[in-house]
UniProtKB/Swiss-Prot annotation:
The keyword Acetylation does not apply. Keywords: ATP synthesis, Hydrogen ion transport, Ion transport, Transport. The gene is atpE. GO terms for biological process: proton motive force-driven plasma membrane ATP synthesis. It comes from Chlamydia caviae (strain ATCC VR-813 / DSM 19441 / 03DC25 / GPIC). This is V-type ATP synthase subunit E. The keyword tRNA processing does not apply. Gene3D superfamilies: 1.20.5.2950.
Length: 208
């Protein structure tokens, strides 16, 4: 905006002197002011355009970084959730299953049934040879032998079961072929985990 005080003074001088030679100077001054205003407007417009570009670029950069942050946060959340699921599975599912399995395999009758089932399985496959049955170290061999009965014991080397170096379950060794059929507690736990893990996850983590 032009300085009104300066314009008033200029008008007063022109009126007082009444000299026509000042008219061209006045016109020149108006042209200079007009040109200055136009240049100022261009500068302001260019500055506003540049500022708009900077803001847009900054906003796009911020949006990109925000999306990257959101993506990283989502990935971190997924990893944390998966870690939590693994922790719950190990603590709640695996430990509970292991405890139940240990209790079940502590029963001499269960060990006897597992031994009998393994012997029957190899006989069905036409396999024969010296057999050694080992049971968990916390299970009484005498009780297992009683549950097996004479007909099954007669098929075993030593006419009875031996104590293995595992907690529970059984192992049947086919000595001639150097085979070991393993239904020890650790093996059974792994089998049950694989078969039941999906159902457990769907039941506990449904919707997560």
């Amino acid at each position: 905006m032009a300085d009104l005080g300066a314009e008033d003074k200029l008008k007063q001088i022109c009126d007082a002197l009444r000299i026509e030679t000042l008219k061209p100077a006045e016109d020149e001054a108006e042209a200079i002011v007009r040109n200055a205003k136009e240049q100022a407007k261009r500068i302001i417009d260019e500055a506003q355009e540049r500022a708009s570009q900077i803001i847009t670029s900054a906003q796009q950069d911020a949006d990109h970084k925000l999306k990257q942050g959101e993506s990283a946060l989502a990935q971190a959340g997924k990893r944390s959730l998966e870690s939590l699921k693994q922790a719950v599975e190990n603590k709640v599912f695996k430990e509970s299953l292991a405890e139940w399995l240990d209790n079940a395999l502590a029963d001499p009758e269960v060990s006897a049934k597992l031994v009998a089932a393994l012997i029957q399985a190899i006989e069905d496959q036409g396999i024969s040879g010296d057999l050694t049955a080992c049971i968990g170290k916390h299970v009484a061999t005498r009780a297992v032998n009683e549950f097996l009965g004479k007909s099954v014991l007669a098929k075993l080397k030593g006419k009875g079961v031996a104590v293995g170096n595992f907690v529970g379950g059984v192992q049947l060794k086919v000595e001639d072929k150097n085979w070991v059929l393993d239904l020890s507690s650790d093996t059974l736990l792994d089998l049950l985990m694989r078969y039941l893990q999906k159902d457990f996850r769907e039941m506990i983590f449904q919707g997560s």
